[in-house]
From Swiss-Prot:
It comes from Brucella melitensis biotype 1 (strain ATCC 23456 / CCUG 17765 / NCTC 10094 / 16M). The keyword Lipid biosynthesis does not apply. Its EC number is 6.1.1.17. GO terms for biological process: glutamyl-tRNA aminoacylation. This is Glutamate--tRNA ligase 1.
Length: 473
């Protein structure tokens, strides 16, 4: 019987959860779910100078917001240092690794010699077969792996295929430093083995690491997990995605106003596809996702595509769910605090009532919040430039006879208001737009908004008439 699939996401808490890391986590999560397995979380916090608790919290928060739940407790790599030392010493005891007492001066001499001879700098193995009794007094050694010197190390990769590394290019690298701390290369192997990880899905910038890690697995006689090294995300210009392209942390995408489901949908299509399907539910992603279908070529991040997908998700969202998502993000967006303060019982009811019209025009929650500001604006309304031009003398003259029509309304519904204004326009020999444009400007202070009859209903009779009255004098 085959082992259950166990994947892992292993971020370093030296900053936010960046978008590439989020995609890696998503691929690990989807593959584990697809196979009925587990995704574990390990925080690679061995770099004590750069690792912070705030970054760890931001990573956990980002994963939770994206809906990527992990199995069990998050594991700290730093706390496992005694186990890393134990395995390093075991490798020495078994003749698979050795103590190296080379001084910094000797190592620099090796590098200089290699440079002079046009070779890449490599440790020359001078302590590989020497007796530790020859060790200089008072020098704390490092532990180096005894890497094979002939042949090649092959990484069997589900995405890249078999990748071969000549062993002459892989020197006896350090697995334990002289202060007893493990190197990243060593700690990762020990942790993945002890956690029972069967499948490693990570960026292809780790491919060279995979060769060295395979040497450690083989030295310990452990099974090597199935590797899948996925292409990095590039910007629209084809260069590796960076801050220059607007590469942000997941927390920033949240504050910009993207929905987690939309971001998941966009990220899964960066380097993986299922036919021509663009929009897919989480259940479909889980059913269809397989590492063998990941592309070898780098995917390009397209903000406009993400925005379009987010808009689709917003339009198809339940009004209450979208309302809740907007309220949750208000503290993080510009002007959101003022909007949140306006959401008393009446304000909440108005915003929910406006949601069908607002979500048709917005691609992000920030745009949704901006579109909703007219509901809570103080009188007299500040007019934007286009609204002011619509409320010139001609616009006000068109609007003046509309006021008594609205004032006389018995039923204040979108349908009855639509019928009354259309009848008035016909009687005046005007097109509906000739009335609707200055009316919208008077009600919202803007030239664009949800449907003008929906706006009248959301604002209510009293507020609508008061705003129109402010403009016609």
């Amino acid at each position: 019987m085959s082992k259950p699939v166990i994947t892992r996401f292993a971020p370093s808490p030296t900053g936010y959860l960046h978008i590439g890391g989020a995609r890696t986590a998503l691929f690990n999560w989807l593959y584990a779910k697809h196979c009925g397995g587990k995704m574990l979380l390990r925080i690679e916090d061995t770099d004590r100078e750069r690792s912070t608790e705030a970054a760890t919290a931001a990573i956990l928060d980002g994963l939770t917001w994206l809906g990527l739940d992990w199995d069990g407790e998050a594991i700290s790599q730093f706390e496992r240092a005694p186990r890393h030392r134990e395995v390093a010493e075991e490798l020495v005891a078994n003749g698979k690794a050795y103590y190296c007492y080379a001084s910094p001066e000797e190592l620099e001499e090796m590098r200089e010699k290699a440079r002079a001879e046009g070779r890449p700098p490599r440790y020359d193995g001078r302590w590989r077969d020497r007796d530790p009794s020859e060790a200089p007094a008072g020098v704390k050694p490092v532990i180096r792996i005894k890497a094979p010197r002939d042949g090649e190390t092959v990484v069997h990769d589900a995405v890249q295929g078999d990748v071969r590394f000549p062993n002459k290019d892989l020197d006896d690298f350090i697995i334990l430093r002289s202060d007893g701390t493990p190197t990243y290369m060593h700690a990762v192997v020990v942790d993945d083995h002890d956690m029972g990880v069967t499948h490693i899905i990570r960026g292809d910038d780790h491919l060279t690491n995979a060769a060295r890690q395979t040497i450690i697995y083989n030295a310990m006689g452990w099974d090597v997990p199935q590797m899948s090294h996925i292409p990095l995300i590039h910007g629209a210009d084809g260069a590796k995605l960076s801050k220059r392209h607007g590469a942000l942390g997941v927390d920033a995408y949240r504050a910009i106003g993207y929905l987690p489901a939309a971001l998941r949908n966009y990220l899964v299509r960066l380097g993986w596809s299922h036919g021509d399907d663009e929009i897919m539910s989480t259940e479909q992603m889980i059913e269809w996702f397989d590492v063998k279908d990941i592309n070898k070529g780098a995917a390009r991040f397209d903000f406009q595509k993400l925005e379009a997908i987010n808009g689709l998700y917003m339009r198809s969202s339940d009004d209450q769910a979208l309302f809740d998502a907007l309220v949750a993000v208000l503290p993080e967006i510009e002007g959101g605090k003022e909007l949140a303060e306006a959401l008393d019982d009446k304000g909440r009811a108005q915003l929910l009532l406006a949601m069908p019209g607002l979500k048709e025009r917005a691609k992000t929650l920030v745009e949704l919040a901006d579109g909703a500001k007219f509901i809570f604006a103080s009188r007299p309304l500040a007019l934007d430039e286009k609204a002011a031009s619509l409320l010139n003398d001609e616009g006000r003259a068109v609007l003046k006879p509309v006021y008594p029509v609205l004032e006389a309304m018995g039923e204040w519904t979108a349908e009855s208001l639509d019928a009354a204004i259309r009848a008035h326009a016909e009687a005046e020999g005007l097109k509906l737009g000739k009335i609707a444009q200055p009316l919208r400007a008077a009600l919202t202070g803007r030239a664009t908004s949800p449907g003008v009859f929906d706006v009248l209903v959301v604002l209510g009779r009293e507020e609508s008439l008061a705003r129109i009255g402010d403009q016609i004098g």
